[in-house]
A protein has these predicted regions:
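Conserved catalytic submotifs in the C-terminal HATPase_c
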Residues: 15-19, 37, 42-52
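Short helix-loop "hinge" at the ATP-lid/N-box region of the Bergerat-fold HATPase_c
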Residues: 71-72
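Helix-loop junction within the histidine kinase core
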Residues: 5-16
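Glycine-rich ATP-lid/hinge loop adjacent to the conserved G-boxes
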Residues: 116-126
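Glycine-rich G1-box
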Residues: 34, 101-102
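Short conserved segment of the HATPase_c
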Residues: 103-115, 135
Length: 165
């Protein structure tokens, strides 16, 4: 909550540097290995390899951590999560796809609202600020988020970043 507040008031200024998104994703993903094993979640990573962008690496890591944490939280026992990173037309695409509870259009519209939790059955597992933080970080880095979701089937969150060669 403190980091979101500081980002909103711009007391934290992003320290942009050229960084490898693929390496970041690998580093963050391994932190969730125990969580996947506990829930018997099948995790797959399909990463194209080195992909460089200019952004604050610490802030981007918060985005990846939040997206993977939500995927683990909302994916049931025995489900699956796929982390994918591709490049095309000067852009880097990072997507997290899960077989979780999914969301309807109304929930998607409010996903970035502070204290909003789409599935209240998991309300004890978070404070509803994660996606508000993600939105602010993406605004500061010039990135965007695309969301596709089907209730009862799962969701895909795709972050689109400018590639830096």
């Amino acid at each position: 909550m403190l980091k979101l507040n500081k980002l909103e008031k711009q007391t934290i200024r992003p320290a942009a540097e050229v960084d490898d998104v693929c390496a970041q994703l690998c580093s963050v993903a391994v932190q969730f290995e125990d969580a996947w094993e506990r829930k018997d979640i099948e995790f797959a990573a399909d990463l194209e390899g080195a992909a460089y962008t200019q952004a604050d690496p610490g802030l981007l890591e918060l985005v990846w951590t939040n997206l993977l944490s939500n995927a683990v939280k909302f994916t049931p026992q025995g489900g699956s999560i796929t982390l994918r990173q591709t490049r095309a037309n000067g852009k880097i695409y990072v997507s997290v796809t899960d077989t979780g509870c999914g969301m309807d259009e109304k929930t998607i519209k409010h996903i970035y609202d502070k204290f909003c939790q789409g599935d209240t059955s998991h309300s004890t597992e978070g404070n509803g600020l994660g996606m508000a933080l993600v939105k602010r970080i993406l605004e500061l880095t010039g990135a965007e988020m695309q969301i596709e979701s089907t209730p009862g089937k799962g969701s895909t969150f795709t972050v689109v970043l400018a590639e830096r060669k």
